[in-house]
């Protein structure tokens, strides 16, 4: 059984999230998703949707076998619990693939790191930021 981990904020779900999770699922048999807690999102605007609600929405998506919130203090706790064969990063996530692989090795976690491919949106709104911008353009 090949276990795959995907992770992210997953605020205001959109087709880009589904593309990412579908591709991640195709890399294994089980897809486990770690949803970032609001307090740990420091590289961009904080999420609009509460933590548990974002986790629940992700858990309801067809490719997802399990979804959990990330640990408040230690990024590696859920990864150790899941014991994945591969961690798939989103095409636009800020993580450095090589540094993450080094950190996993330092933590004694043996898994590969892959990156999902970018998708052509065909005019679909594929980012939370673009959704928020569109709401402001149309409704504010």
Swiss-Prot record:
Source organism phylogeny: Archaea, Methanobacteriati, Methanobacteriota, Stenosarchaea group, Halobacteria
Function: Catalyzes the transfer of the AMP portion of ATP to flavin mononucleotide (FMN) to produce flavin adenine dinucleotide (FAD) coenzyme.
Binding site for ATP: 9-10, 14-17, 92
Requisite cofactors: a divalent metal cation
A GO molecular-function annotation: ATP binding
SS bond list: none
Protein name: FAD synthase
Entry keyword set: ATP-binding, FAD, Flavoprotein, FMN, Nucleotide-binding, Nucleotidyltransferase, Transferase
């Amino acid at each position: 059984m090949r276990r795959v981990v995907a992770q992210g904020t997953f605020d205001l779900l959109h087709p880009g999230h589904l593309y990412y999770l579908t591709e991640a699922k195709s890399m294994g048999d089980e897809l486990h998703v770690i949803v970032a807690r609001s307090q740990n999102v420091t590289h961009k605007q904080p999420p609009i949707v509460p933590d548990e609600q974002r986790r629940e929405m992700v858990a309801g998506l067809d490719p997802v076998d399990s979804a959990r919130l990330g640990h408040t203090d230690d990024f590696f706790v859920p990864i150790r619990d899941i014991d994945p064969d591969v961690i798939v990063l989103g095409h636009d996530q800020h993580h450095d693939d090589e540094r993450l692989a080094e950190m996993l090795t330092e933590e004694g976690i043996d898994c590969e790191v892959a990156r999902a491919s970018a998708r052509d949106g065909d005019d679909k709104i594929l980012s939370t930021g673009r959704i928020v911008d569109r709401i402001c353009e149309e409704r504010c």
